[in-house]
């Protein structure tokens, strides 16, 4: 198969979406046997960031450098022309991944939805962000394949977007090899509990902060606000150095930081929410994310059960590989053609 894969999110500082896109691309390349084309309009600066991300990957690049790249991507889908074939020649599959919805004349049409949080909680987001997610939802209804990152999101997409179950494919994210117990550890002289939770309402760091005085520990709480913007390459060090990892999120499509922390050998405290069941499995202490008292008790429990939770977490994390993510994509394309 000749597969055109939208990599435009990799032209920005890396996020969970970008990590998934790069991981799935690497997984498909590792599985082998098919032609992969990285495509999309990007800015001059974005092109440099994207080239860094794709360095060393044997993938054909069809990248168009344009000013106002984000606006260009949105306009391309809104205008419905020119067709993607003009830039890509022929292809069997066109897979778009984020805000860009390119028109096409032929071939299988596939997309990815990471979660439907913006449609569940529109009052928590800027109207423009909600509008963009609504557009993505409309496209999902007309795509041949809709990839999701969990069974939870699959059910959400089927119910809320009325997408037929036979067009939805679950492709779990993988864990990069750099997330492992051995390696450098963050250490500033004070033992700590780590969280990636931010001020975003869904991430729920406010309730975690309210819980912290109740933990009654000499440990300190380390959040992204305490260490500044966390570059992707620093995450393994922060996980490894932690006495425990807390993920008090109110809603997720999957919850990859939980698996990353487990892969680094850290006991985890995770919200008791269906969206995190698949990420945490039975290898974490589950907790009501709205109760500071429950969160404090769960942190104390995770610290006390470290010898039990760490091996369970390591075993659970080994289930998630980018090679398997890539194989699911390729098999899904082949089955649908």
Task: State what each model feature region is.
Residues 1-337:
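Carbohydrate transferase catalytic cores enriched for Leloir-type hexosyltransferases
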């Amino acid at each position: 198969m000749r597969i055109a894969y939208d990599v435009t999110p990799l032209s920005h500082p890396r996020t969970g979406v970008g990590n998934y896109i790069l991981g799935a691309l690497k997984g498909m390349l590792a599985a082998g046997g098919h032609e992969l084309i990285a495509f999309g309009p990007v800015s001059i600066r974005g092109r440099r960031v994207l080239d860094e991300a794709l360095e060393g990957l044997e993938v054909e690049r069809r990248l168009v450098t344009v000013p106002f790249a984000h606006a260009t991507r949105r306009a391309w889908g809104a205008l419905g022309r020119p067709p993607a074939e003009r830039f890509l020649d022929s292809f069997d599959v066109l897979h778009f991944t984020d805000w860009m919805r390119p028109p096409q004349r032929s071939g299988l049409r596939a997309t990815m939805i990471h979660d439907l949080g913006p449609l569940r909680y529109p009052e928590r987001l800027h109207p423009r962000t909600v509008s963009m997610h609504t557009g993505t939802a409309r496209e999902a209804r007309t795509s041949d394949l809709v990839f999701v990152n969990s069974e939870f999101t699959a059910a959400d997409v089927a119910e809320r977007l009325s997408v037929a179950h036979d067009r939805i494919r679950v492709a779990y994210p993988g864990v990069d090899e750099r997330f492992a117990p051995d390696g450098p550890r963050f250490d500033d002289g004070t033992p700590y509990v780590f969280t990636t939770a931010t001020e975003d309402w869904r991430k729920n760091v406010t309730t975690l902060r309210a819980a912290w005085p109740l933990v009654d520990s000499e440990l300190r709480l380390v959040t992204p606000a305490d260490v500044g913007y966390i570059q992707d390459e620093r995450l393994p060090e922060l996980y490894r150095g932690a006495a425990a990892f807390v993920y008090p999120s109110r809603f997720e499509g999957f919850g990859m930081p939980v698996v990353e922390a487990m892969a680094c050998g850290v006991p985890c405290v995770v919200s008791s929410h269906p969206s995190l069941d698949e990420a945490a499995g039975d290898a974490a202490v589950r907790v009501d994310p709205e109760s500071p008292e429950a969160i404090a008790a769960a942190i104390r429990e995770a610290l006390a059960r470290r010898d039990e939770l760490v091996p369970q977490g390591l075993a659970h994390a080994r289930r998630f590989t980018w090679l398997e993510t890539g194989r699911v994509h390729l098999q899904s394309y082949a089955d649908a053609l």
